[in-house]
């Protein structure tokens, strides 16, 4: 989980028996270790699932996507929950007007779903992708 803050998402994955770890620039161990979403501190092709809901907090969304694809295994799943068409929260630096502006950043993944989701803490769009190549 990228930008995992206190680790709620990590805990949710673990509750589903999915081995997981979070990274954030403010660690909260044991669920969240220190790491920058623009330079993910893991080897290539490490994870079956990559999840984030902080694209709007990314200074360089293209680098976040590139790093997400790098650490995701071939045939792995990448899930981005984003806020589309609304102002971001107080930590946001990237406003997303259309989901395509994020979708188009992916070079090695195929979109499985890109759809509106029930708004939750401002997040209103879900993009689910499958990594198809390295």
Regions inferred by a protein language model and the residue ranges of each:
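A short SAM/SAH-binding and catalytic strip from SAM-dependent methyltransferases
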Residues: 48-61
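A short glycine-rich, Lys/Arg-flanked "PGG" loop and its adjoining helix->strand segment in the class I
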Residues: 62-77
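Class I SAM-dependent methyltransferase SAM/SAH-binding core
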Residues: 1-39
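Conserved Class I S-adenosyl-L-methionine
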Residues: 85, 89-117
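A short acidic, Gly/Pro-enriched loop at the edge of an enzyme's catalytic core
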Residues: 38-50
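Short conserved AdoMet
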Residues: 59, 73, 107
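Conserved beta-strand signature within the Rossmann-like core of class I S-adenosyl-L-methionine
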Residues: 75-85
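Core SAM-dependent methyltransferase catalytic element
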Residues: 109-134
